[in-house]
Swiss-Prot record:
This is Alpha-amylase 1A. Pfam families: Alpha-amylase, Alpha-amylase_C. Glycans are attached at N427, N476. The active site is at D212 (nucleophile), E248 (proton donor). Disulfide bonds join C43-C101, C85-C130, C156-C175, C393-C399, C465-C477. The keyword S-adenosyl-L-methionine does not apply. It is found in: Secreted. The keyword Plastid does not apply. It catalyses: Endohydrolysis of (1->4)-alpha-D-glucosidic linkages in polysaccharides containing three or more (1->4)-alpha-linked D-glucose units. GO terms for molecular function: alpha-amylase activity; calcium ion binding; chloride ion binding. Belongs to the glycosyl hydrolase 13 family.
Amino acid sequence: MKLFWLLFTIGFCWAQYSSNTQQGRTSIVHLFEWRWVDIALECERYLAPKGFGGVQVSPPNENVAIHNPFRPWWERYQPVSYKLCTRSGNEDEFRNMVTRCNNVGVRIYVDAVINHMCGNAVSAGTSSTCGSYFNPGSRDFPAVPYSGWDFNDGKCKTGSGDIENYNDATQVRDCRLSGLLDLALGKDYVRSKIAEYMNHLIDIGVAGFRIDASKHMWPGDIKAILDKLHNLNSNWFPEGSKPFIYQEVIDLGGEPIKSSDYFGNGRVTEFKYGAKLGTVIRKWNGEKMSYLKNWGEGWGFMPSDRALVFVDNHDNQRGHGAGGASILTFWDARLYKMAVGFMLAHPYGFTRVMSSYRWPRYFENGKDVNDWVGPPNDNGVTKEVTINPDTTCGNDWVCEHRWRQIRNMVNFRNVVDGQPFTNWYDNGSNQVAFGRGNRGFIVFNNDDWTFSLTLQTGLPAGTYCDVISGDKINGNCTGIKIYVSDDGKAHFSISNSAEDPFIAIHAESKL
């Protein structure tokens, strides 16, 4: 009995680390600021057939409607209530999206903003996405309801009431992040209101949560909230399934708060990943791709089974958050595709792909003065994601997840899932290759000269279609063909001026 109980508790503890994606689906995509109606369509027409596991959606709860600057993306991170009512859509549209996505095997992960309410400087009134009244000055949020008792004003010891020193773990948790009213998560009432919101989402059918600003909450307070959560909806998930949890903790080293403080609750965002990979692929600070041989824990990252990884996210692609100038984004398309390709081929971590919108970037003294700009809109109403004849998106939606090179690497990861990291090659510089057991092989040329070499792929003999330069369609290849001989070797030739200086082949791209 003791052994059974031990196994049961371990099983229970492990649940929040597994993604709840359908078998054979290994990545999620952040459809940043998309409307629920567009996400529902995208699940059906694209994400499900292309092998995506799920979608991270923008915060679905009511927020402040900010008009100066006009409707910025960050207003979504200033809650007013837990009503499902935002510029992405209302509760009916949200339910419809979750149902339709789940029905085609694509999961929904909610960005949960639970550390705080809106900023202390916002004026009282009903300028909110559902018209709820709120008064930050008197700490009054009747639509929840929260009042003065439910905030950390009395607990914070800094003069301003805001976080002033990141080397003081207590003020990082108990004071206001950039003036955002800090909820008293130590109170059972507050925990219960948050759990009620999250349980409402679980009952609708979501598969898990990104926990925003986790660094600014005590790990024990997060745990107390998670302990109140329901199991997932058994219409779509096995009986007893727990929500997937990944916590946003920016830990680049050098601060008292560590990612590992949060492992007991679930996975954690590994911000070192994109910052370092960007530096390597840009070849800054003497970094080379050959150094990626021991990528992952060997670079001082958290354990693979605790990491949620990404090349860029909605914050750092516009200079917010962490990582600085090394972060690669869709603006750096050629290098970005290589970085995302490397991430999706490498076994480390659980992978999230970014899907962005364009904004009028304008740098003054090294800072993008338009880093606040919200999604494509007509006078504040978010524009539809239109699909062009060539399958790209219109209306200033970037849709990196639809770029052939990225979409095909999402599938590559599915095909090689569970296979070991094998057959590493490097030239001591920026030409590298590696395989995933006998299921996949990828080659990169990030040097300033041509790559031409015969390598051991570990794959069965045959003709393979390179899924970077083309697609396998009806048994034919629209891109480069790679011939693997009986001994598993193949010749690769990649010009340094190629549109995409990398090649990837896998078991399902065999002709």
